[in-house]
Regions:
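Short beta-strand-centered aromatic/proline hotspots
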Residues: 2-10
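Long, low-complexity intrinsically disordered regions
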Residues: 36-107
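Structured alpha/beta reader/binder surfaces that contact nucleic acids or chromatin modification marks
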Residues: 1, 13-23, 46, 53-62
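A eukaryote-biased signal for long
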Residues: 82-211
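Surface loops and adjacent helix of pleckstrin homology
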Residues: 6-7, 17, 105-106
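Short solvent-exposed strand/turn elements
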Residues: 13-41
Length: 211
């Protein structure tokens, strides 16, 4: 299980707290380290096993980063684990490796004077860097993608975060042409759409989220 806190829809803040208990007592999220904050789909909440922690102390501070990574337009095919004999082909967003570093305040609310975000795309507020270098590891590791988190990929990602005790994102690593450890293989299979019904049912019963 992982502890998460719903923020302004559709965002959720995940914390670096993993437990085998479905409902740990007296969780104070103010004292926890943030794993990552991201936008999620209703599908993720519907299929994940979610438990409400009624006695938890929420952190209502607006501490989440307003810097994000936005993928390029278009799409492309990538091959993970090349030369391993067990390669996995995936279609991902972005017509070339990398992405844009952008500013996007997740707490922003439309007003009559400003009904959409400032950037012409309407997706974010402004561009900070139009092409993040593929070697800019500090930037790549620090900031989240602007896309939506879905089931079951996000659940597998959270499991990997528990293994590495930090935020990791196999999909983002694919975007930036990074080599992937073997532990990421199931996540990459999910991205590729190559998992079967048996895998899906196992995932449905295995991954749980506490909010």
């Amino acid at each position: 299980y992982v502890v998460g806190q719903m923020l302004k829809h559709p965002y959720i803040r995940f914390y670096n707290m993993f437990t085998r208990e479905s409902s740990p007592n007296n969780v104070n999220t103010i004292k926890l380290t943030v794993l990552f904050t991201a936008a999620i789909t209703r599908q993720f909440l519907r299929y994940s096993q979610v438990y409400v922690l009624k006695d938890a102390t929420p952190d209502i501070r607006e501490i989440d980063s307003d810097i994000w990574i936005n993928q390029f337009s278009g799409s492309r095919k990538v091959i993970a684990y090349q030369g391993s004999g067990e390669e996995i082909g995936c279609m991902i967003l972005g017509n070339k490796p990398g992405g844009l570093l952008v500013k996007k305040n997740l707490w922003w609310i439309p007003t009559p004077e400003q009904p959409i975000r400032l950037h012409p795309s309407g997706v974010f507020d402004e561009i900070i860097c139009s092409d993040i270098p593929l070697t800019a590891n500090d930037i790549i590791d620090k900031y989240e993608l602007t896309g939506l988190c879905v089931f079951p990929y996000t659940n597998e990602r959270l499991y990997l975060c528990s293994l590495y005790n930090k935020s990791v994102d196999p999909y983002k690593d694919l975007i930036f042409n990074r080599s992937l450890p073997d532990n990421y293989r199931l996540a990459v299979e999910i991205i590729s759409g190559g998992y079967d019904d048996k895998n899906r049912n196992e995932i449905l019963s295995a991954y749980k989220v506490q909010i």
